[in-house]
């Protein structure tokens, strides 16, 4: 009997000691969590977003300002969008050209930051349609607009153990290439309403996805009209435009060009023009055009099938 009582006392003492040990461990864990911060999935963390802008603000047009849009994408869904003008005077004074664009507050997780900069007079006067940065488009027939634009994309992971905040840099690049077509024209063949008609061969990109850095929509064999042929020194500018380009790629452009007068006749013609385009590059292409004369017939041999109708 005494032996049983002794065993019971020892067992009870060990249980009490074990319980004290468990309580001590729980207290240590609690203190550690209090020091480190308990993870809260709904807690937001500050992210400072800078823009690497380089020569972004070397712009001759003082009537427009760079306007920035930043889109926050999570699981292929836009969860935030911010738009604002960038003060160029302050931006020029930034060292290393890292301009503080904005601060975000985001829960922990994985994101993509998409950014777009174009030039506007007011918030509601863009040349580009930018409601969705996965499909940026150009407006048609908008004269006098500054078509330069810049894009940036950055994968971003917010860690819950970084409560102080993170700093990230958006490196902007140009998603556009531009070209100018020039030619020699006879003064006697010109009038005030000369029009260039360009027929593109193949696909012409019309929408750009900032996330993938690629063109996502195209027109097949479109025809574009450019009014107001201008003289520059001893050459005439037939057409000048900019196009979306896949990031880091070189693309070829093929087209035919006709120049018409105010009477509706075709005065000059170049059936096939080819040149290469590269993002952030401007190409000037001089075009030799055949003079159709008063009769609107090309001087020289005509090839191809001709249908003759006799009444």
State what each model feature region is.
Residues 11-20:
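Bacterial N-terminal signal peptides that target proteins for export
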Residues 28-30:
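C-terminal motif of bacterial Sec signal peptides marking the signal peptidase cleavage site
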Residues 32-35:
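Bacterial signal peptide processing site
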Residues 40-41, 169-176, 244-246:
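Conserved "repeat-terminator" motif of extracellular CCP/Sushi domains
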Residues 51-64, 182-191:
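Structural motif
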Residues 68-126, 191-279, 307-311:
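Tryptophan-paired
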Residues 89-91, 121-167, 263-293:
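Structured interaction patches on ligand/partner-binding surfaces of diverse proteins
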Residues 138-229:
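Acidic, serine/threonine- and glycine-rich low-complexity intrinsically disordered segments
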């Amino acid at each position: 009997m005494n032996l049983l009582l002794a065993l019971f006392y020892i067992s009870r003492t060990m249980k009490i000691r074990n319980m004290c040990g468990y309580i001590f461990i729980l207290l240590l864990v609690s203190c550690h969590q209090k020091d480190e911060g308990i993870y809260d999935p709904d807690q937001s963390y500050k992210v400072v977003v800078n823009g690497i802008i380089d020569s972004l603000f070397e712009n001759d047009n003082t009537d427009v300002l760079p306007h920035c849009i930043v889109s926050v994408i999570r699981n292929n869904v836009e969860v935030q969008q911010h738009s604002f003008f960038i003060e160029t005077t302050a931006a020029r004074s930034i060292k290393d050209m890292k301009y503080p664009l904005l601060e975000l507050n985001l829960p922990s997780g994985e994101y993509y930051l998409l950014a777009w900069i174009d030039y506007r007079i007011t918030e509601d006067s863009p040349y580009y349609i930018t409601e969705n940065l996965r499909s940026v488009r150009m407006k048609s027939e908008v004269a006098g607009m500054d078509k330069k634009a810049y894009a940036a994309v950055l994968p971003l992971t917010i860690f819950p153990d970084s409560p102080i905040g993170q700093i990230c840099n958006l490196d902007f690049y140009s998603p556009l290439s531009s070209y100018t077509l020039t030619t020699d024209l006879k003064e006697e063949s010109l009038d005030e309403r000369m029009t260039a008609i360009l027929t593109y061969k193949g696909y012409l990109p019309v929408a750009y996805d900032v996330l993938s850095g690629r063109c996502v929509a195209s027109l097949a064999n479109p025809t574009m009209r450019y009014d107001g042929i201008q003289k520059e020194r001893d050459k005439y500018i037939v057409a000048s435009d900019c196009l979306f380009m896949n990031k880091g790629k070189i693309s070829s452009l093929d087209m035919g060009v006709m120049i018409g007068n105010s009477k509706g006749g075709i005065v000059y013609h170049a059936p096939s023009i080819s040149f290469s385009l590269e993002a952030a590059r401007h190409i000037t292409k001089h075009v030799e055009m055949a003079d159709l004369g008063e009769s609107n017939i090309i001087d020289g041999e005509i090839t191809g099938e001709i249908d003759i109708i006799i009444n």
